[in-house]
UniProtKB/Swiss-Prot annotation:
GO terms for cellular component: cytosol; nucleoplasm; nucleus. Its EC number is 3.4.19.12. Zn(2+) 1 binds at residues 25, 28, 49, 56. The keyword Zinc-finger applies. Zn(2+) 3 binds at residues 153, 155, 236, 239. This is Ubiquitin carboxyl-terminal hydrolase 14. Residues 300-774 form the USP domain. InterPro entries: Papain-like_cys_pep_sf, Peptidase_C19, Peptidase_C19_UCH, UBA, UBA-like_sf, Ubiquitinyl_hydrolase, UBP13_Znf-UBP_var, USP_CS. It catalyses: Thiol-dependent hydrolysis of ester, thioester, amide, peptide and isopeptide bonds formed by the C-terminal Gly of ubiquitin (a 76-residue protein attached to proteins as an intracellular targeting signal). The active site is at 309 (nucleophile), 730 (proton acceptor). Belongs to the peptidase C19 family.
Length: 775
């Protein structure tokens, strides 16, 4: 039966730049591995689950009226262990190794006519073949993250224009050996040479590098990595870095090569690097006999996308909070079926993640593992969900979270909460369950006068006592501490350098931190990091947690202010005028107030600049108005990065120091460190946030915050970190779950979900702690 909808408008032949979501539904985690597979739209290449899922394919059709889809399903192949390996006759890197693991099934159909289409139809055949050969959306997502880190260089910008001559690529081989694969062409002289050996073997004999050593020609392009849209591997041997050539089309035309006629047939350097990361062992070693692999609701693992364990451990911890999980599930049930742009909508991807992690539908042993080990008494681990769409959306435009590098889980958690708050579509802002108000007291050591300031927060840094008890192989050994001891240390006064506004003493001051309100969920970050010079070193201090996980936080409650306290005066602002410029301007006949106003407007710079400003503003109606104190106050800068604040706190600075340093250094971390260290006499009080006055705060306090005592919390989750830096190493999450009617600790290590007998491993690795308030 013919279909009138089988047209070039409805059936598109995708090019290399097209993102193809052929692995899973864009609105939920139903995938090609589930019964019934998924429907891939052949017009825009977004996918939706069919009748056996949540019918998101029908949702997509109703929104777009794209009629032609192909149902994609796959079944794992059984591994034949005694099959001899295929003889290697040439260097070959296959684009999609999944073909070795799965049998794929494709059924094209028209949703309007409700018929199955002939897969041999020429238009369908071309579209399906191009779709199969294209890079999958999940891989393209990760490759983009790696490629975003590449830049150009002076050697590319200043590449000399050579006379055009033709380089023959037919049956091309290395000029110094017979290799025809992994060929690199010199962008100076056009010489063809093989590349260096690659991770895992193969690659070449390094003759491209030898060519650079012999000639000094710095740039080469990998021929079979070039695609018609200008994507190509460029390597600068002089910089010893992979680069981007924005003028690759012009540079290739110098050698008579039109890139529009080329096709990418080999893996790029980014793909090879990604492959190495994905094959790296991110998992823990074999667990002890007391451990048990778990499956079911709330016990779904997340596949490591390559340095994404910080994201996985954070999301597992967040979705272990009942209020957060219920909120996101409700939005999933109401919003995901009406969202117009699911692949770029944060709320849609959060809802998708909620259904994936909480429902238990996808928490089951790996099909391939079961097929290849049918007689094993030990169930294989889960395959794990791959949250690449969520990672793409949440990291969009961010210089760190938009890459495939390891990141700080605490920074990511605070960043994510801010992102959710800004993009919330619900009447209830679920991130308010983490909100609380902190009070800081500054006390002059000389005159004893005090100042109180308040600010809002969603996380508190825990001071970890550091008592050295020995050394093993150059590594310091520290005494065990409890969370209660950390709480006691956190509320102790910190002494700081300070010049008092009241008594003018430079004796210093103390600051103490307390909490004016307590959130439903309290996030604590253990400050295990020490600033040694400009190097941040992680300290392996064991932190013991209570077996029952119950803690009383009354000691953190801010006390009533004593009636007999004397207060420091409100800070006033003055400016040291450029007296020389003022005298010269007055000598020209300008009144003092005009001289000052000109210098204020021009940064208190010099006579000539101020004079030019005066001539341009002689008619300003307020030019003779006396200067108000408010005009001398520094302008508030709301762009201070919370991630940068947390990074500076890891160096051992206070939040107030971090904010002040970043304000003074245009949000640059290195300059902020220099500024703080070079201003020992600066008063680093935390300025009250707008609207944070206690009277205003109490009137508008969210229903989740509490000022009631006793303040009791239950430890719900621990994000643990192995490694020397929060931006490297490996993250896992320990979460308290109900297993067989009892509260047990469960380890979430990427896709591995196991019951653990103890928290011994979390002692020296605990980094972020999530507590639930017991009301």
């Amino acid at each position: 039966m013919s279909c009138p909808h089988l047209t070039e408008t409805n059936v598109v032949i995708p090019d290399n730049s097209q993102v193809i979501y052929r692995e899973e539904c864009v609105r939920c985690f139903n995938s090609q591995d589930e019964e019934g597979g998924i429907d891939l739209c052949l017009t825009c290449f977004q996918s939706g689950c069919g009748e056996t899922g949540l019918k998101h394919s029908l949702v997509h059709f109703e929104q777009t009226l794209h009629p032609i889809v192909v149902t994609i399903a796959r079944q794992p192949k059984q591994k034949i262990n005694d099959e001899p390996p295929q003889k290697i006759t040439k260097l070959e890197i296959r684009e999609d190794s999944d073909e070795d693991l799965y049998d794929y099934f494709y059924v094209p159909k028209c949703l309007v006519c409700n018929i199955i289409l002939d897969i041999q139809d020429p238009l369908l055949s071309l579209s399906l073949e191009a779709m199969k050969n294209a890079t999958k959306a999940s891989n393209k997502s990760q490759l983009t993250a790696w490629e975003n880190e590449l830049t150009t260089c002076d050697h590319i910008i200043n590449l000399p224009e050579n006379e055009t001559y033709v380089t023959n690529l037919d049956n091309a081989t290395c000029s110094k050996c017979d290799l025809a694969e992994n060929l690199w062409m010199c962008l100076t002289c056009g010489a063809l040479s093989c590349g260096r050996k690659q991770y895992g073997g193969g690659g070449g004999n390094g003759h491209a590098l030898s060519h650079y050593d012999d000639t000094g020609h710095p740039l080469a392009v990998k021929l079979k990595s070039i695609s018609p849209d200008g994507q190509a591997d460029i390597y600068c041997y002089s910089c010893d870095e992979e680069r981007i050539d924005p003028n690759i089309k012009t540079h290739m035309l110098n050698f008579g090569i039109d890139i529009a006629k080329l096709n990418k047939t080999e893996k790029s350097l980014a793909e090879l690097q990604l492959e190495q990361n994905l094959n790296w062992d991110f998992g823990a070693s074999e667990e002890d006999d007391a451990s048990k692999r778990l499956f079911g609701p709330g016990l779904t693992g997340l596949k490591n996308l390559g340095n994404s364990c910080y994201l996985a451990s954070t999301m597992q911890s967040l979705f272990s909070i009942k209020e957060f999980a219920i909120h996101e599930l409700n939005l999933f049930n109401t919003y995901n079926s009406v969202c117009q742009t699911p692949t770029t909508d944060l709320q849609c991807q959060l809802g998708k993640l909620a259904d994936g992690l909480v429902s238990g539908k996808f928490s089951k042993p790996s099909k391939i593992g079961l097929l290849n080990n049918p007689s094993s008494s030990i169930l294989p681990y889960q395959d794990g969900l791959r949250p690449f769409m969520f990672k793409d959306v949440v990291g969009q435009g961010h210089s760190e979270f938009g890459t495939s590098q390891q990141q700080d889980a605490y920074e990511f958690l605070l960043y994510l909460l801010g992102k959710i708050r800004k993009s919330s579509i619900a009447k209830t802002d679920i991130t308010k369950i983490f909100d609380f108000e902190t009070e800081q007291k500054l006390s002059c050591l000389s005159c004893k006068r005090v100042r109180y300031s308040s600010f809002s927060s969603q996380g508190l840094t825990l001071t970890v006592p550091r008592v050295k008890i020995g050394e093993i192989e150059g590594e310091q050994i520290y005494e065990e501490v409890s969370i209660d001891q950390c709480l006691d240390a956190t509320i102790q006064p910190d002494q700081m350098e300070y010049t008092c506004e009241a008594c003018k003493s430079k004796l210093g001051a103390t600051t103490t931190t307390a909490m004016k309100s307590f959130p439903k969920v309290l996030i604590l970050q253990a400050n295990r990091f020490d600033l040694q010079g400009y190097q941040v070193k992680k300290l392996s201090i064991p932190i013991i947690v209570n077996e029952d996980g119950i803690y009383n936080f009354d000691r953190l409650m801010a006390k009533d202010h004593p009636n007999d306290e004397d207060y420091l005066p409100e800070k006033t602002e003055t400016i040291e005028w450029n007296q020389s410029a003022i005298e010269q301007l007055q000598a020209m006949g300008f009144p003092l107030v005009r001289c000052q106003r000109a210098l204020l407007a021009t940064g208190n710079s010099d006579t000539e600049t101020a004079m030019n400003w005066l001539f341009e503003h002689m008619e300003d109606p307020e030019i003779d108005k006396p200067i108000e104190v408010s005009e001398l106050l520094p302008k508030a800068d709301s762009s201070v990065s919370e991630e940068n604040v947390q990074s500076l706190c890891e160096f051992g600075f206070t939040v107030a120091q971090a904010r002040k340093g970043l304000l003074e250094s245009n949000n640059n971390i290195e300059r902020a460190v220099d500024w703080i260290l070079n201003h020992p006499d600066e008063s680093f009080e935390e300025p009250p946030l707008e609207g944070s006055d206690s009277s205003i705060k109490n009137e508008n306090m969210g229903s989740w915050e509490s000022t009631n005592v006793p303040v009791n919390y239950n430890l719900k989750a621990i994000i643990s970190h192995k490694g020397s830096s929060a931006h490297a190493g490996h993250y896992v999450a320990f979460i308290r779950k109900e297993i067989d009617g009892k509260q047990q600790w469960v380890l979430f290590n990427d896709e591995k979900v196991l019951q653990v007998a103890s928290l011994e491993e979390a002692k020296t690795t605990g980094y972020v702690y999530l507590f639930e308030r017991l009301d």
